[in-house]
């Protein structure tokens, strides 16, 4: 069984493992004996964004993430904060996540911080919502960076600078871990990290 999102409860993985059905998680954390994980390097991605902000001289910046319990959001936020100690960072966490959450959070964040120069969103959907929310409010549009590189990120109205996940390599490692686990269920838990890269587009040059 490969679990690819944060939505299914961990109890589902525990149930499969109890039946000795191999489980591999993608971009999710769990300390479960015999459960393998493969994740994008969230910390590397956040550092790439922070370094971009630093090179551009942006010092008043923001972060929008999903809820604090979300594994990927937490890793991206912590690495970003650690890398931006010389910047003023304002943050928002959204219970729902997704486009509408980004739409509302960006409007609130920029209204409270009118001099904001750049905004890092923990997912592309948050970032796309942020762009539209600020445009609709006729608010100043800071540089905006997302994370994922979903197809919509390259759409003309957005041209979103983002951190690209290597989905092909994530899938390759997930299948490899699963097949090995099928052959040897008693192996210790294993974890692999997949590098990411920054894709520069118009939203944050």
Predicted segments, located by residue:
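Hydrophobic alpha-helical segments within soluble ligand-binding/sensing domains
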Residues: 38-63, 99-108, 127, 165-184
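Alpha-helical recognition/docking segments in bacterial nutrient-uptake
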Residues: 1-51, 109-115
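Alpha-helix capping/helix-boundary segments
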Residues: 8-9, 69, 76, 125-127
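Alpha-helical structural signal in soluble globular domains
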Residues: 15, 19, 75-86, 101, ...
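An alpha-beta-alpha
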Residues: 47-87, 92, 190-204
């Amino acid at each position: 069984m490969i679990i690819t999102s944060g939505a299914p409860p961990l109890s589902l993985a525990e149930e499969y493992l109890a039946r000795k059905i191999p489980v591999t998680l993608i971009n999710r954390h769990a300390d479960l004996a015999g459960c393998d994980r493969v994740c994008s390097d969230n910390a590397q991605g956040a550092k790439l964004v922070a370094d971009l902000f630093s090179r551009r001289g942006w010092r008043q910046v923001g972060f929008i993430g999903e809820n604090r319990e979300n594994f990927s959001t937490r890793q991206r936020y912590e690495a970003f904060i650690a890398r931006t100690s010389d910047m003023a960072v304002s943050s928002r966490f959204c219970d729902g996540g997704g486009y509408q959450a980004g739409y509302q959070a960006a409007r609130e964040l920029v209204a409270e911080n009118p001099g904001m120069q750049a905004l890092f969103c923990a997912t592309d959907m948050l970032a796309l919502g942020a762009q539209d929310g600020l445009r609709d409010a006729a608010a100043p549009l800071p540089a905006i960076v997302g994370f994922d590189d979903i197809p919509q990120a390259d759409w003309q109205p957005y041209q979103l600078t983002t951190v690209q996940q290597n989905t092909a390599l994530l899938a390759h490692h997930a299948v490899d871990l699963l097949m090995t686990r099928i052959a040897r269920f008693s192996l210790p838990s294993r974890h692999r990290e997949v590098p990411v890269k920054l894709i520069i587009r118009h939203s944050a040059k």
